[in-house]
Amino acid sequence: MADHTPMMRQYLEIKSGYPDAVLFFRMGDFYEMFLDDALLASRILDITLTSRNKGSGDEIPFCGVPYHSVTPYITKLIENGHKVAICEQVEDPKQTKGIVRREVVRVITPGLLIETENLSPDDNNYLLALHQGAEEQWGVAWLDLSTGEFRVTELAGPGSALAEAVCINPAEVLLADGVRLEEFPADLKEYLAQKIVSRAPAWVYERDYTSSLICDQFGAASPDVLGLEGLPSGLLAAGAALYYLRENRKSAIPHIRDIRVYQRSEHLALDPATRRNLEITASMAEGKKSGSLLGCLDRTVTAMGARRLKQWLGYPLVGLEPIRSRLDAVEELLEGATTRDELAAQMKGIADLERLNGRIGMASASGRDLRALHDSLQRIPPLRELMATMQTALLCQLTKEIDPLEDILDLVGRGIVENPPFSLREGGIIAPGYNPELDELRSISHEGKGFIARLEAQERARTGISSLKIRFNKVFGYSIEITKSNLASVPADYIRRQTLANAERYITEELKNYEEKVLGAEDRIHELEYSLFQEIRERVAGEGSRIACSASGLATLDVLISLAGVADERGYCKPLVDDSQVIDIHDGRHPVIEAMKLGERFVPNDTLLDGGESQILMITGPNMAGKSTYMRQVALITLMAQAGSFVPAASARIGIADRIFTRVGAGDNLSRGQSTFMLEMMEAAGILRNATPKSLIVMDEIGRGTSTFDGVSIAWAVAEYIHDTPTCRSRTLFATHYHELTELAATRERIRNFTVAVREWNDQVIFLRTIVPGGASHSYGIQVARLAGMPADVIERAKEILRNLENGEFEEGAPRIAKSRRQRTPDPSPQFSLFESDEDLLRTRLKKLNIATLTPLEALNLLDELKRMA
């Protein structure tokens, strides 16, 4: 290091403290990167890589980006999974001898973003901290630095922790140093391998230390005051998240004002497979919002509302009162369409107050941010006036929560100009009339500039040089510029200041005196404006809790307006939600498919599930007939009702579910050595272990990934278990291709058979999409193959084979399907047939008879059976 320049020694010393981050090292108007950071950044950012000490034996690779346009470069590095450490000059170079002091002012990580340009407005940006405690208790803490949201809970087992992580969908996961992913269960390990995982020192996970961090942040005497008693793992996870936040922000985070302790039992439980299969927030086809339930219901007009709706669908409720409160509010807004439209119009102009409040609290808000806050607050009084006549409890509560913040509105309105500049340090941000001293300095500056114009005219007249001009630049200040052709006319009192190629620049005592006065005023204006802006921003930050309350109320109102608008447009009904085991839906529809308008009328269907006669609906019918759509729509209607939404049906009674499980199609997971069938069995086992009489199960084609007999046996046993086991006994939709399972309805009192109605016409099959009582008589697989565009030859051959199988036709000891019309009959082979001949079957059946135990009726039936076999 001794061979390096002082600047490079400073760089290397600072870089040693941040080995896992790309160091953006401020050099004047640029952030520069050196050595390995430069090699990495130049490749990812596609910027020029050069080097210092070119041609020598110790070339130092480096590259740089302009400080005023740094955000997109940071964004690209973050998107590629890298952290960025911002190292600023913390001294004025003009007032420093030697090397300028520099410090890392913050470290930007994927989970700690606050800049609007880096964030999706509709999605939260969570940092998730996980900690495995004693007895498989997992602490789960998650926060969004951009909004100030902070939550913590404790869950039993890695499966529950994984389910919660999938729901949260964090940008970054925090674990303790020394925790090895290889020690986690395969599914959790696989999930974390796809995430950006950061580490906190092991010593952070010590109760006294984390307790002190949490108490200091929230001003509490003890963590117990915050509801963290009895959550030892949750406390450590929350403390680690705070530690990581403070270490990387390098500044106070006052906008994180409270921590919410929640219990998972407060919400409808949805495991990762169910969230994926029901396409709640993202479609399975493209992984996007479009085509999901969220995309179908989202008519919100604010970023806050969009995020709140996503939370409601991700965390449906199980408490009757809060569900009914939401439904009542949606109903009132639905019935008052005119008021609803006026409310939505007012909401459209409201900025993202949650994230504005976060930036204000962290002292990173600009003048434009404060003005956006002001313009948003202006919309609250007319909005509250529209809400004044609301009757339902939730809407009345929201009216109180949405604070117009008149004092903040007045402060920002008086203090900040309507169109503030981007920069905070170059003036023009504070409104005239706000500060007398600033007004006086501006007057001096303005008069000084007028003096310059008058002086220029005066000197032209005095010297007779018509081309004389008074110029200004930041290095030399003001000067009188004379072209070289006019140098003979320069007065004796002119003092040369600068020589140019075609001119000379001069200064006079009079100009110098006014320069000092004007430039001094300009510098003072910039300093004073920045100081006044900081003062205004700090006063606004002091009211952050009120801003947060208003923002939350506005977000909820936006969601309710959105749900009411969708319900009005699509003819949704208000569900009756109770604590029974009944799910009774009349003319239910699939909300997403119905909204897609695919060119055919969506066929509604009824559903009745209960804990009595209709606990399990055994649903048979051909592929493409609509079984999966029907079952998913029942699950989605249940979820929507518990989220507080109206539902796509003529009427609906929904007995609250504690969990929704779905077991539908899966693909091989070869990276974990798991086949489709293994995944199917694992998901089914998880359902049987965790389901309760309050749960809703959707089982689609269980057992199809193995042989027919094995599949039938497994599906049969699973259905019996759900029916017979008192601790399970869930309401269940059970779709199957195994027609044998319809026999269960004869032996199990709470199983009912249903099928999808089909009409055959001219050798064609027409799917009526209607669910009717009874079992399917045909699978219609060949007709589906024809619809899929299978070649005609294949279709005809399939028909022939099907007739062979249905008629039990054999030839020379083998089924007729073993031979093709195009094949020559092979020579007899000494190898035994895999199929028994009819004669062998008869002989085997007779040998097993016990004539002594047969009744006369059984003997007659048996004789008839043997005759049919002969």
Swiss-Prot record:
Signal peptide: none annotated. Residues 813-834 are annotated as: Disordered. ATP binds at G621, P622, N623, M624, A625, G626, K627, S628. SMART domains: MUTSac, MUTSd. It comes from the Bacteria. One of its GO terms (cellular component) is cytosol. Keywords: ATP-binding, DNA damage, DNA repair, DNA-binding, Nucleotide-binding. Coiled coil: none annotated. GO terms for biological process: mismatch repair. SUPFAM superfamilies: DNA repair protein MutS, domain I, DNA repair protein MutS, domain II, DNA repair protein MutS, domain III, P-loop containing nucleoside triphosphate hydrolases. GO terms for molecular function: ATP binding; ATP-dependent DNA damage sensor activity; damaged DNA binding; mismatched DNA binding. This protein is involved in the repair of mismatches in DNA. It is possible that it carries out the mismatch recognition step. This protein has a weak ATPase activity. Belongs to the DNA mismatch repair MutS family. This is DNA mismatch repair protein MutS.
